[in-house]
Amino acid sequence: MENAVWSVIKYTPKHGCSDEFKMALERLAEIMNKPDLTWSLIELDTGEIVQISRIPSIDAIVEGQIAGLEWLDSVDHLLEKDEEGSRTQAYSGLELDAPHSFQVKN
């Protein structure tokens, strides 16, 4: 069985654009609405939004990549960019099958 992939993506809405960005997250929710995806959004006290996703495989990531990038392009004007021009701060990696993981069923 292929390991699942976890992804953590942080978005920083521009000042005054937070409400519009949150409304745009509804379109992202439609893209992410797949039975095999687990994901959630949290809002930090800094106003940043963090998307945490568990995707069942690398193939599933590739499958949704175009729709995800199109969504990100559609909200580009609402997001702060870092000094290199990136709209997000993102991390991803393969899920470890560890005994303490909440994914392990007893």
Residue ranges and their predicted role:
Residues 27-39, 54-92:
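An amphipathic, aromatic/His-enriched active-site/gating alpha helix that lines ligand/cofactor pockets
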Residues 89-106:
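Short, low-order "capping/linker" segments at domain edges
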Residues 13, 44, 94-96:
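A compositional/biophysical signature of low hydrophobicity enriched in polar/charged and small residues
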Residues 4-11, 50-52:
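Active-site-flanking beta-strand signature of metal-NTP-handling nucleotidyl enzymes
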Residues 40-46:
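A short beta-turn/loop motif at secondary-structure boundaries
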Residues 10-23:
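Short, surface-exposed ligand-recognition loops at beta-strand->loop->(often short) alpha-helix junctions
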Residues 13-15, 55-57, 106:
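Non-catalytic surface loops within mature trypsin-like serine protease
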Residues 2-4, 44:
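Short coil/turn motifs at beta-sheet boundaries
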